[in-house]
UniProtKB/Swiss-Prot annotation:
Region span, Disordered: 28-47, 60-85
Subunit structure: Component of the MIS (mRNA N6-methyladenosine (m6A) methylation) complex, at least composed of IME4, KAR4, MUM2, SLZ1, and VIR1. Interacts with VIR1.
Top-rank taxon: Eukaryota
Gene: MUM2
GO biological process: meiotic cell cycle; negative regulation of pseudohyphal growth; premeiotic DNA replication; sporulation resulting in formation of a cellular spore
Phenotype upon gene inactivation: Mutant is sporulation defective and fails to perform premeiotic DNA synthesis. Increases the rate of degradation of KAR4 protein. Decreases the level of VIR1 protein.
Provenance organism: Saccharomyces cerevisiae (strain ATCC 204508 / S288c)
Record protein name field: Protein MUM2
Subcellular location field: Cytoplasm; Nucleus, Nucleolus
One Gene Ontology cellular component: cytoplasm
Family the entry assigns: Belongs to the fl(2)d family.
Function: Component of the MIS complex, a complex that mediates N6-methyladenosine (m6A) methylation of meiotic mRNAs and is required for initiation of meiosis, progression through the meiotic divisions and sporulation.
Length: 366
């Protein structure tokens, strides 16, 4: 509320302006016309008149001997001096005040229609709602307002905006519900992603452990082969000890044992050669290693895997052939049944034709 537009001093508190007020009965009709000229909505154009109209409605001024103290909030006025308030703070017509039930209904309707605090501040019905004594007579409304402090005039704008329309409150509640649902959905998605991330991390960790284990096995085999090759290289220069045999029988036994070992080694080399040739046929792009291009164990493993695949393929082919043969026999049976039905139909038609001829011959003979 802009008090400066109505010659109101904001340094004085509200209660200093509301003490010891007197009312002019001849101005009630003018005030009633002023309030009837405006529509009952939030804007209230009838109340917001220009400064010139407000000065015409309020010609009386404060007396010369009046003094106001902004701290104490009191005036020293003569008992017979009358003056008017600014238009926004002026008195109201106490005639035709609705009853309590009607006032409660109007208040409820104003709240549901989104009325602001300024409506209740300027509405004479709301100002007169709680200003009656026990006998039903209106009390001095200005005396009830005298309890307001100077802070009220400063924070009147915040008080005006404190009321929000009902539909706006409903929209805010719906927005809050939607935001809560979106937050819950986001939390669920975040939890699902966290669980999936933990699963992936565990899988990666297990794979890393497997890689480390395989590296360890490979390094152990490589070290063993390196040590064996080094030992053979060192011992190749050492001459073998020669022993004179005691008899020819001992010489014969040694020669026979060495021949048997050589034959066994030859058989193993033949098997390795065959496995190598098979490995070359299966996978010609084998990697070259330091101590040989092919490993017998890996080749054997590949051969076993390949043989298993071939046996599975043979089983599947046998199943397919058996299924095809069974279907072929079923098709042949169905064709034979169809031929039998056709032959039976032909035989039945021929028998009917012969019966008709015999009956015609008998009729001719008679």
């Amino acid at each position: 509320m802009n008090y400066m537009a109505y010659d109101y001093d904001p340094q004085h508190s509200l209660e200093t302006s509301f003490n010891n007020l007197a009312f002019h009965p001849h101005q009630q009709s003018q005030q009633q016309a002023l309030y009837e000229s405006g529509e009952r909505n939030d804007a209230r154009p009838g109340l917001m008149n220009t400064l010139g109209q407000a000065s015409k409605m309020n010609n009386s001024m404060l007396p010369q001997g009046s003094s106001a103290s902004p701290l104490t909030g009191q005036h020293s006025l003569n008992s017979t001096t009358n003056f008017n308030m600014p238009p926004s703070m002026n008195t109201y017509n106490y005639q035709n005040v609705p009853q309590a039930s009607m006032r409660n209904t109007l208040n409820h309707n104003n709240i549901m229609n989104g009325a602001t605090a300024n409506d209740y501040w300027l509405d004479p019905m709301n100002n007169m709602t709680n200003n009656k004594d026990t006998n039903g007579n209106p009390n001095d409304s200005m005396s009830s307002m005298s309890n307001m402090t100077a802070k009220t005039s400063i924070n009147s704008t915040a008080f005006k905006n404190s009321f929000v329309p009902f539909n706006h409150v409903t929209a805010l509640s719906m927005n809050n519900v939607n935001s809560n649902e979106m937050n819950s959905n986001k939390d669920d998605r975040m939890e699902a992603l966290e669980v999936e991330l933990q699963i992936k991390e565990s899988q990666i960790e297990s794979l890393e452990n497997e890689i480390q284990r395989l590296k360890k096995i490979f390094n152990e085999g490589l070290n063993y082969k390196q040590n064996e090759h080094k030992y053979e290289k060192e011992n190749c220069h050492i001459p073998q000890t020669f022993e004179l045999p005691a008899s020819l029988e001992v010489i014969f036994r040694k020669l026979s044992s060495s021949l048997h070992a050589k034959e066994k080694e030859l058989a193993e080399t033949k098997e390795n050669l065959e496995s190598i040739l098979t490995a070359l046929a299966l996978n010609p792009t084998n990697s070259v290693t330091k101590y040989g291009r092919y490993d017998a164990e890996s080749i054997a493993h590949k051969m076993v895997v390949r043989l298993e695949n071939l046996t599975n393929e043979n089983k599947e082919m046998a199943k397919m052939l058996a299924y095809g043969r069974s279907k072929e026999t079923q098709i042949e049976l169905q064709l034979a049944k169809k031929e039998n039905l056709e032959l039976r139909e032909k035989i039945a038609s021929l028998e009917a034709h012969l019966a008709s001829k015999e009956s015609s011959k008998e009729d001719v003979a008679n």
